[in-house]
Swiss-Prot record:
Disulfide bonds: C1-C13, C2-C11, C8-C14
Keyword set includes Protease: no
Record-given protein name: Alpha-conotoxin-like Sm3.2
Domain comment as written in the entry: The cysteine framework is III (CC-C-C-CC).
Chief localisation class: secreted
Organism: Conus stercusmuscarum (Fly-specked cone)
Amino acid sequence: CCIARQICEGCICCI
């Protein structure tokens, strides 16, 4: 898991 963000279902690599 890269970063936990609400925008991405739980824990996903958002770039």
